[in-house]
A protein has these predicted regions:
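Bacterial N-terminal signal peptides that target proteins for export
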Residues: 1-5
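Hydrophobic helical h-region of N-terminal Sec-dependent signal peptides
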Residues: 6-10
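C-terminal motif of bacterial Sec signal peptides marking the signal peptidase cleavage site
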Residues: 13-16
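Short, low-complexity N-terminal intrinsically disordered segments enriched in polar/charged residues
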Residues: 19-58
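Charged, low-complexity, helix/coiled-coil-prone segments
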Residues: 26-31, 71-74, 128-131
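Short solvent-exposed beta->alpha transition segments
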Residues: 37-47, 57, 61-111
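Conserved short hydrophobic patches within well-ordered secondary structure
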Residues: 51, 81, 128-129
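Exposed beta-sheet edge and beta->alpha loop/turn motif
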Residues: 102-154
């Protein structure tokens, strides 16, 4: 019942936020990607992604939103965030497993390869973009990497 109520609420929100494009929110920078993040950066960023993915699986949009970066929150409120997830990333709400792969650093951003498997065993390759500002991690963007080079998973 909670799922149905959440889905209805989110669907209503979609009509007012359908012009939001999460891919367009990703920073467009041409700085070359450095080979890897430090072990600490990879561990901390992975823990942040894991927390958000678990919140989605537990149908807890408020907690999932709390993992977003301050810059993301400045541009999208909770209702818009829910609309983005439902319209573009509904599979996150039915995740059965996930693997967090390689981390690369680009300027002040951390790019993580993530593979999500939903309850129907469909796999989704994703790229998560995180920032760490004044010691605080945040998810800036996430996108499905359909048609791109397959990321490496450890």
């Amino acid at each position: 019942m909670r799922s149905a109520a959440l889905a209805v609420a989110i669907t209503v929100l979609l009509t007012s936020c359908s012009s939001s494009d999460p891919v367009a929110q990703q920073p467009q920078q041409s700085t070359p990607v450095q080979p890897t993040c430090s072990n600490t950066e990879a561990d901390q960023g992975s823990a942040w992604i894991k927390g958000q993915l678990e919140a989605f699986t537990n149908e807890d949009p408020e907690t999932a939103y709390s993992f977003a970066s301050e810059s993301f929150k400045a541009g999208s409120n909770l209702e818009q965030f829910i609309a983005i997830i439902v319209s573009n990333y509904g599979f996150l709400l039915s995740t059965s497993s996930y693997t967090i792969g390689d981390c690369t650093k680009q300027d002040e951003l951390f790019l993580f390869d993530v593979e999500v498997t939903d309850i129907a065993e469909q796999k989704y390759s994703m790229k998560y973009t995180l920032s760490k500002i004044a010691g605080n991690w945040g998810v800036d963007a996430a996108s499905v990497t359909v048609g791109e080079d397959e990321p490496l998973y450890s």
